[in-house]
Structure formats: C-alpha cells, structure tokens
Amino acid sequence: MNNGKVRIYELSKELNLDNKDVLAVCDRLEIPYKSYSSTLSEEQVVQVRQVLAGAAPSEPVAAASAADSPKAERKQEIVSVRRPTPQAAGGAKPEIVGRPTASEKPQAERPNIVAPPRRPAAANEPAKAPIKPARPEKSAEKPEIVTPRPPAPAASAEPAKSPSRPAPAATPRPVAETKKPKPAAAELLRKPEIVRRSEAKPERTSEAPTPRPKIERRPEQTGPARPQLGQPVAGNGVSKPAKPVKPIELVAPPSRPKVAASASGVPAAASRVLPNKPQKPTAPGGPELKQRPKPAAPASGEDLAATVDVFQPVPPLELRRPTAPARPARPRKGWEEEEDERAAANRKAGNKAAAKAKRRQLIQDDDDDDLLTAEQELAAADALNLAMSLARPSKPKVPQAKPAVAVMPTKGRKPRRESARERQHRRRMEREQKPVRPELISLRSSMTVQELAQLMVVPETDIIKSLFFKGIAATVTQSLDVATIEQVAEEFGILVEQETEESGARKTTQMVEDADAESLQTRPPVVTVMGHVDHGKTTLLDAIRKTRVAAGEAGGITQHIGAYHVDVEHNGDQHQIVFLDTPGHEAFTAMRARGARVTDIAILVVAADDGVRPQTLEAISHAKAAEVPLIVAINKCDKEEAQPDRVKQELTEYGLVPEEWGGETVMVPVSAIKGENIDQLLEMILLVTEVEELVANPDRAARGTVIEAHLDKARGPVATLLVQNGTLRVGDVLVAGSVLGKVRAMVDDRGDRVEAATPSFAVEVLGLGDVPAAGDEFEVYSDEKSARAVATSRADEQRQSRLQQAMASRRVSLGTVSAQAQEGELKELNLILKADVQGSVEAILGSLEQLPQKQVQVRVLLAAPGEITETDVDLAAASGAVIVGFNTTLASGAKRAADEAGVDVRDYDIIYKLLEDIQAAMEGLLEPELVEEPLGQVEVRAVFSIGRGAVAGCYVQSGKAIRNCNIRVRRGSNLVYTGTLDSLKRMKEDVKEVNSGYECGIGLDSFSAWQEGDIIETYRMVTKRRTLEV
C-alpha cells in the first residue's frame, strides 16, 4: 500500500481472491473504479474487507441493494410474467410477500442457478457463521444471493471450477459477490431463488422428509444449471420459498433441495440423470451437495440464518473437495474397469473411435491413487480462487451423468462398431475382388479409350496394346469409332450392340402441368405440313392462306420453317389453325423433326405423279415418333399422269391404310394450284382437332419451343417462338436454351406487332441476348435473377458437351487416317459458315458430316447465323479458311477486308450448290493422280537390223502412235518390254505421230529383240482429279 491507497489487484492477492470478485464487491458498495489497477482508499478497503469477511454493516448492503433495485425491477418485469406464484401453497405465500416484494421475482430466477452449485459455498460460510450467528444470516445471504446469480449468465463456462471453490470456507461469500457485479440487480432477484426451492412444494417437504435428501442432491445440481440457461423456469415457485424456509431452519436444508427438485419440472427431469453421480459419492457427496444448495437459499436475506445453522454441522469442506471432482470420476473409472477386458477384446476386433476413447480413459485410471491425490491437490488450490462458480459443479455432473448413460448404450452398440469394421473389411475385399466383365456392351457413338476400358472392365493398357498391334497408336483420351470398338471388344470376348438414337421428333416435355388443370381452355391446333421436296407443300399452304409464298423461295424450295395463322369458318364459327411449313430437302431433317415435335396434327403431302419418296418416309417416321395424328394430302391430282390409287397402295405398305379401304388414315386428294378440295382438307383438320381435345392454360407464364432463330443486322437476335402453354407478353423475362432475354417486341406472321401471344400462337421475338438454337424450349421466369442462374447453368453444360464433342472429333479409325496425318497426307478444309437462320446452319452442318472425309476432313471453325463481318474475315485470314455464306450478306467493310486479305468468300442461296462446291473444294485439296490414257495399238510386221540394233516395221491398227509416248510390247500373252517410244519415222522421216491405217518405223534405244507379230500398245499418263472415297 502506497500513501494509504491500495490497488484492487493487490487487495485481491492479499485476500486470495480473483480480481473480479473484489470488483463485484466494489460494484455493490458503489465504489468507483476503472479497472483492477484502480486504487482504493483505506476506508474503501475497510468496507470491502468487512463485506468479504461477512461482518459488514447492513448499510452498504442496503445501499447496494438500493442501487441494484432498478435493475432488479427490470428482471422483476421479466420474472413476473412467469412468476404467477398462486400455484404454490397459499399459506407460504403471505410470509414471502411480507418479506421482500421486490426480491420475490428474483427468487424465481435464483432457484435455478443457486440451488445446485451454491451449496458448497454455503457450506464454507457456516464455518464462520458460529462467530456471529445473527449477522451471518444476513451477510451470508447477500453474498450468496450474489453467488447464485453469476452462475446464471456463465453457467456453461464455470462448471469445472465447482469442486475447487468449496475449499475456502471464509472466502465463499466474497466470491459470490465477485460474479455478481455483472448483473447487480440480479443479486436481489436471485435471493428469492433459494426460497423458491424450500417453498417449491412445502406439502411434499412435510409429507416425505426422508427421501428428499436424495432428491435434493439430484435436482439441486441439475436445477441450478438448467434454470441458469432458462431463467424464466424459476418463476413458478418464487413466492413460496421465502417464509416457509425460515421457520424450519434446521429441517429446511434437507427439504429445500427436495422441494426444488419436485417443484420445478426441469429439476425433476434432471434428477433422473443426476442420480447416478450422487449415488456414487453417497457418503461424502451427499452432505456436500446439500450444503451447496443451502447457500443459494440465503439469497432471500433472512433465510441465511437457517442455512448457516444447517451448514455449521458440516464445516469440513475438505470432504467436499475430493468427493465432488474425484469421486464422480472414481465411480466411472471403477465402472469402466469392469469393461477393461471387453475393451481389449474390442481393440482386437477393431472397434470404432468411441471405444478407443473409453480405452484411453481406462488407461488413465490405472494409477488411481496418484490421480486422486493430484486431483485433491488441484481442487484445494483452485478452491482458493474460485467462489461463485460452485453452482457449476452440478452442470459438470449433469454432463457426466449423460456420458454414463451414453456409455451404457455404447455397450449395446458394440456390435454396430464391429459391423463398421466389418463393413470396411468388406469394402476392402470388394476392391480386391475383380469386377465381373460384361458379356455385352451397348454403344450409341464413339467413345474414348478410357471410357471403353471402364465399360468393358478391362485395363486401359490392354486396350492400347490391342490397338497398337492393329497399327493404331492411341492414348487414353483419344476416341475410337464404333468399328474399332467392335474389333477391340471381340478380342476380349465381348459383344457390341449399337443403341438406336431417339427420334428428334419425340416429345420429351409435357407443356401442360397438373397445376394447370383448373384453368384449361381450348386452344387452336398446330398443324405441320411435311413431305418430299417439290411435292407442293408450300403451294398447298399458299392455297390455304391465299398468298404466294412459294414464288419467293430461292430455287422454288423451302429452306425455313414458316409459321402461319389461318382463320377458317366451320359450322358458322370462326376457328384458327396454326400451320408450320417445313422444308422437304434431305438436309433439313432436323427441321422436320422439330416441326413434328411441336405439332398437334401432321399433314403428309404426297405428289400423285411421284409417289412415296425418301423424305416422305422420313416424315412418316417423324409423325409416328411424335405420336400425332396424320392426314395425307395427295397433291397434284389435276395432272394427267396423277395416280392417286397407286399412292394409296404405296402408303399402305408403310402402315397408312386409307379409311375407304378399312383403315384409320384420312386421305384427301387435292390440287393446290386449282384449289380443289382445300375446304375438305380444312374440315378434316378441324374434325381431328375436336377428337384430340387440345387445351392449355392462358393464365400462367408462357412456355414453348423455339421454331427458328437468326441474327438480323438491324434488329439483333430474332427468334420465332411457338407458345404452347401460358401467355407471352412484352416485357417478360425468358430463357431459351442457354440464352437469356427480355421480350422487347413481338411480330406475328403478317408483320403486325402484338402485345401478347396466347397458346398455339407463333411470333417473332426481339430482345434476346444471343441467337438460341432452333428446337430449344423456352420458359418465362418471374424475376431476372433466377432466369440468369438457369441460363448460366445451361451454358456451362453446353460448354462441357462441346468439349466432349471436340474430343470425340479426334477419332481414331482402323483406316490410315492417323498414319496419313503423321505423314502430312491428311488434308483439312477450314470453313467459316454464316447463314440466315439457325436452322440453315444446322442443316448445312448435318450435310457436311455426310461427306466422305477419309482423305480430306472438314473443320468448321465458326458456324452461326448472321451476316459476314470483318471479324469473320480476320479469322479466315488467320486460319486459311473459306467463308461460306448461305442466304446472308456481307457487312459494311467485310468485302474490302476480304479482298485485302485474299480470303475466299462464297455466297449461296440454294443448299444443293453449296454442298457441291464444298465437295469440289475438298477434292481440289487432293493430289491429282496419274491415270493411263490408251492411245492406240501397233502391230510389228517386219524387223530390220541396223548396226547393232534393230528397227520394227509396224502398222498402226487403231488409235495412233506418238513419239515419246509410253509403250508396252506384248508377245502373245506375255509382256516383253515397257518403256518409251524413242524414234518414230515414216518414209525415212521423223514424225511426231502416226495415225491409224498408216505404216511407220519404231526404234527403241534399250530394246531390239523384235519379232514379227508383236503388239505394241501405246499410251500416255495424264493427271486426273481425284474424287473423295466413301
């Protein structure tokens, strides 16, 4: 101490207390301070010492309580809600009400915290109580009142400290106060808590005093811990405890714990779990537990006297120290020792980590004496510094009891632990076990060596080795074509079957959902017109629409899907029909399949003078795959060579039997040019529509399919959408495939703007972020955020599929493709394809895949709808590609850039010519081959010897003989000589050639063994353009 002042931390060291305990007393005495380094005057030190010694005058306490009263009032408000004390016996209530009205509410809170943990502290206090019997009651009550409160806020943190705190008999009171500083008002509130225990059920206390001591131990410990977390629980018995406890001071201590246990439902439940722990340290632990709850009771103020008297008989706190911490551990250890042998057996069997934890505890228990002594020493040392947390021991005991309960089930679960090991063993065995090799595998397309190895359950190295012996150097990431896979699989004794691809016309999505059932309305039918090229599909549609669309088609053939609306009058009512016109050229298979997938009725147009053709059969298969009704329109019946009956006969062979022949297929002979039987055809369409019962819900967000899409240089991405359910409106946010867009405008088939598109309505939509793929389904979303998330995820999926396709394109076949590539003989034709609409791009790419690519491979660097731009020209110049445009134009500056870069730009409007030119370009990349061209045949009729050689006198039988041409000399069936005609003379003069019917002389430098009758074949080698080999 310097100058009569003492720092708080020095005072706490002197008193063997925590700094926070002294700070709590300062709060109670209203002594100002900033931290534990603050100084106290001599008077303030005296006051603190008096409070901590339990002899402090009641005035500071009263002052503290007065200061705390406002805070207590707040808690009183909270407690009062739960406090309805009328539940307790009416006799006890009046006494409690008379004592502390303000503290009654706190009493409810306090029983929860104080009852179990505070007993040890109280036990220490009674030792000093005998010196001042009157005062200790009140002084002990207040510190203890503080003690119960701190546990409530920090119940979870200090449970372990409980055993050590009971040791200091003189200090426990100040310790309680130290924890109290955080909630000063709480001290007053918790005073009634102790009373609550005693009052909890006075009837029971009087009825059965003997069993209560046991129950007291269990509920007290559990009761304080649990109520601390949930303070409102204590509110039920606040009023009862105050006065009933005082009259029965000596008897109350045992009864109070019991009442606490029974009074509150929570303690009762806790008692069930706690009994195990209290039972283990029965002799020493019992009194200790009783002592702890009793100090909680003094919180009321007057009850302290009773509690002090009771605690005085049990001053030896030393027993408490070992019993609370050490003995609960001993029973566990003793109990676990019985399982030592079992645990050892479990180790061998390979038990789980839980069993290992038990074993560790058992191993620690081997030195019981050493551990006990060490624990006792630690408990004694901690007790000097611990105070209020004595309430916590109950909590540790609760968890301890729970583990004990948990351990018991673990014994029952032992077989489960063993089963886990067995499961691991089984998995190990399964890994070691070789999987069964399949006898049959099914393929849809090419696959990589790695995928094939997994499918065949064969090591990848074995497949690579097999390919190597076939002359193919492959890696695990290279793709094998189906023919190669079949040969490899055959080596391993596995059969291969090819899966049939699903038709593109199959309907995969149900547009009308169950939720739409209550709002369904009839919708117009969607009718798709299909058939072979030049059979009159568009002309028939023109006759129906009374327009002339066909005249505007390039080459007179349709190369897009067109959507048209037609109003038809039937039985006096106006009906609307939506027609989809599909191209008939073989390159547009995907378009026809797409049209069939979204259609309700299919019209098959067959020319009466041409009959069933390849695309007719394809259209039939699309209609069957889409499971839509089919109406046959036999067109061009006005021609003289028309044979409708022959067409019906041909269709019968493919399962389409006309109604007049006893079948179910409607067949109508029509003439598109003359307009004959058009009304009959429309009537049949409406009749079939009535049978189909086509419905949709126009009151929901729109869903449908992208029929066609293209990039317009003025309007941006434009898509033709067919609404199949719901209503599409301007401003809707939609996702088509992986493309996000917001509808800015909609245009119908006649070019008029519309604000809404109802079911079965086809419109051109502006406002998409990119050109969607034709055939993609679109859906309208309520908010842009969710729509963007869907579009992003779909874009990622498409990116992955493109990567897989790129890997698959690096295919390896049994031919000489890989060898040619290594030798530089494999040629590539790089193309950049731009078309007017997405469907045309799709059709051209499909046609290019059909071209033979053994000698020359076509690499499409870019395929997209839209006009040819300077960017395309730059890409073509960098990669040596040819730009191919289909029904598109060049952007400004693109033509000049192409001329400067020397890029070849081709534009086409008919797909026939485009494919022919691309095939010709592929053939042009091939090295020309030398072909033998026969010139003529010459017969040797005489042989003239000249010097060391000989000259043959010949007659040209056919063709001609040309000097320096190639010749073959044949004698009978034998080839005598092959070489060059070195000298050719006629009438002793050198000539260039001799025609048939003339005689000539032929001399060779390296051959002179002529004989009469020899035949000389003259020929020459010419270069000929190579064609693509299939």
From Swiss-Prot:
Residues 56-361, 394-434 are annotated as: Disordered. Keywords: Cytoplasm, GTP-binding, Initiation factor, Nucleotide-binding, Protein biosynthesis. Gene3D superfamilies: 1.10.10.2480, P-loop containing nucleotide triphosphate hydrolases, Translation factors, Translation initiation factor IF- 2, domain 3. Residues 134-144, 188-206 have a biased composition (Basic and acidic residues). Its main location: cytoplasm. The keyword NADP does not apply. The keyword Cytoplasm applies. GTP binds at residues 531-538, 581-585, 635-638. Residues 522-695 form the tr-type G domain. Pfam families: EF-G_D2, GTP_EFTU, IF-2, IF2_N. Residues 671-673 are annotated as: G5. Residues 581-584 are annotated as: G3. Residues 531-538 are annotated as: G1. Residues 635-638 are annotated as: G4. Residues 56-69, 111-132, 154-164, 259-273 have a biased composition (Low complexity). Residues 556-560 are annotated as: G2. It comes from the Bacteria. One of its GO terms (cellular component) is cytosol. It is found in: Cytoplasm. One of its GO terms (molecular function) is GTPase activity. Belongs to the TRAFAC class translation factor GTPase superfamily. Classic translation factor GTPase family. IF-2 subfamily. One of the essential components for the initiation of protein synthesis. Protects formylmethionyl-tRNA from spontaneous hydrolysis and promotes its binding to the 30S ribosomal subunits. Also involved in the hydrolysis of GTP during the formation of the 70S ribosomal complex. NCBIfam families: IF-2 (TIGR00487), small_GTP (TIGR00231). PANTHER family: TR-TYPE G DOMAIN-CONTAINING PROTEIN, TRANSLATION INITIATION FACTOR IF-2-RELATED. This is Translation initiation factor IF-2. The lineage of its organism: Bacteria, Bacillati, Cyanobacteriota, Cyanophyceae, Synechococcales.
